[in-house]
Amino acid sequence: MKLVKESRDAMCRSGSQMIKCVRSFTNNNFLDLYYKEISKSNTPATHPVVTAVCSSILGIEKEKAAMMLLYGFTVSTIGAALRLGLVDHIQSQQILHKLKPNITSTIEKFMSIPLENMWQFSPQYDLVQMTHEQKFSKMFIT
């Protein structure tokens, strides 16, 4: 199953920027090979995969890499709500603080699941994204 095009593109732009950044201060043959394959369009630069590869190369434990990814996603989502005026700065920090245990428990629950048992299933989110793709005016670049 593929993500909605707009989400896929945004995820790949983010991953591309991350790998360019890490390559700027790290010399690693595997990272260079991976970057070349991305550049030739042989593989996408999806942000979660690039995060995993870069984290491994930088010696970051997979649990900490997962924490970075989920925490970053959470901050990004709360930041969007803040920009839309749905919450204020204090509320956004309160929400983030309340979600920390959920982030930790999610990582603990799913960290050891084999790759073949992972998939995406969020039909309501997909429908919202598909509708968003067709809109003329957008508040955020995705």
Feature-to-residue mapping (PLM):
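Internal, conserved structured core segments that host functional sites
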Residues: M1-L58
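Conserved active-site and cofactor/substrate-binding residues in soluble primary-metabolism enzymes
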Residues: K2, E6-D9, R13-S16, T46-V49, ...
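Generic preference for well-ordered secondary structure
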Residues: K2, Y35-I38, L58-E61, A65, ...
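Context-gated lysine
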Residues: K2-K5, K20, K36, K40, ...
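Short, surface-exposed acidic
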Residues: N28-Y34, K62-A65, H89-S92
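A contiguous pocket-lining binding segment that forms or flanks enzyme active sites
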Residues: T43-G85
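C-terminal auxiliary extensions adjacent to catalytic cores
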Residues: G72-T142
